[in-house]
Regions:
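ATP-binding/phosphotransfer module of carbohydrate and carboxylate kinases, centering on a glycine-rich
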Residues: 1-48, 108, 152-155, 160-284
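Short glycine-rich anion-binding loops that position phosphate/pyrophosphate groups of nucleotides
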Residues: 57-59, 120-122, 228-229
């Protein structure tokens, strides 16, 4: 997917495309040509482009040019340099959940700390303090998907057992409806399939444990994002009740919020990084 964003009061995605190219060289060539089409259509002066952000479900090294861990997708550690061959602009790599967290923080003006929990093909997250992303000493900060929720529980793709990812990634729900998450939530909404309703209730039970733990650790708002988060608005009160039952300090669970960006939050965040940097430099 490609998104183009400008600097303004609101960030407006101009175009999204999906490429079906599977071969490495073909993919990058397609990416290059599609980017050129977008720029020709929307940008009269490409010298004003601040940069290109590449958002990936991997752990990024501190230089934002190399990958230190990749299991969800097959990405080489030096993929940055391949991108550079095809994209003739300043370029950085971003963890997808961190980017999405930055997008949500920007949307909320960034004045309050937030925790963003991404519930997509894998589970990740971000801890935002203002527009600053906490990445940790080794770039593995906020890898919430690998918090242990059930000791010796289900096997995770990391080869450990009991990780949140094994209980709350989007496929836990979408697998019931042939990989179609929208269809799953439509079935739940219809209220006739008790099996799916019970599966979603169990999903929320595990998710509530995770969100409660995040509240205890960070004492700030927790935003539900990713593929599943986009569908949580209709179920948020039920979910808040589950989380509040675990909390010894407060019964008000309004700190749990649903993401603003229902799709492509990580793409927005990768663009916001450059915009935020530019705005800060103007103020210096």
């Amino acid at each position: 997917n490609l998104k183009l964003h400008n600097i303004g009061t609101h960030l407006s995605p101009q175009l999204t495309f999906c490429t079906s190219a599977t071969k490495r060289g073909s993919f990058f060539s397609t990416l290059q040509s599609e980017l050129e089409k977008i720029l020709t259509t929307y940008v009269s002066d490409t010298s004003k482009i601040l940069g290109v952000g590449i958002s990936l479900p991997v752990i990024i090294s501190s230089d934002q040019k190399s990958i230190s861990y990749a299991e969800v997708i097959n990405a080489s550690a030096d993929i940055y340099y391949t991108f550079c061959k095809y994209l003739n602009f300043p370029l950085l790599l971003f963890n997808d959940a961190n980017s999405a967290g930055l997008a949500e923080s920007w949307r909320q003006s960034g004045s309050e700390p937030i925790v963003y929990l991404s519930l997509s093909s894998s589970v990740g997250g971000a801890n935002m303090n203002g527009h600053s992303i906490y990445t940790g000493k080794h770039g593995r900060g906020c890898e919430f998907g690998h918090m242990t929720i059930v000791p010796r529980g289900r096997k995770c793709y990391c080869n450990r057992a009991g990780c949140l990812d094994a209980y709350c990634c989007a496929s836990i729900l979408s697998d019931f409806t042939g990989g179609d998450l929208h269809a799953f939530f439509e079935e739940v909404k219809a209220g006739k399939n008790k099996g799916l309703i019970n599966a979603f209730d169990e999903y929320m039970d595990y998710l509530a444990i995770a969100v409660h733990n995040l509240r205890m650790c960070y004492d700030c708002d927790v935003i539900l994002g990713g593929y599943v988060g986009a569908y949580m608005s209709e179920h948020i009160e039920t979910f808040r009740n589950k989380a509040s039952e675990l909390n010894p300090f407060e019964k008000d669970a309004s700190y749990i919020k649903v993401c603003h960006y229902k799709t492509e939050a990580s793409a927005v965040g990768a663009a916001v990084y450059y915009i935020d940097k530019f705005v800060k430099e103007l103020g210096e």
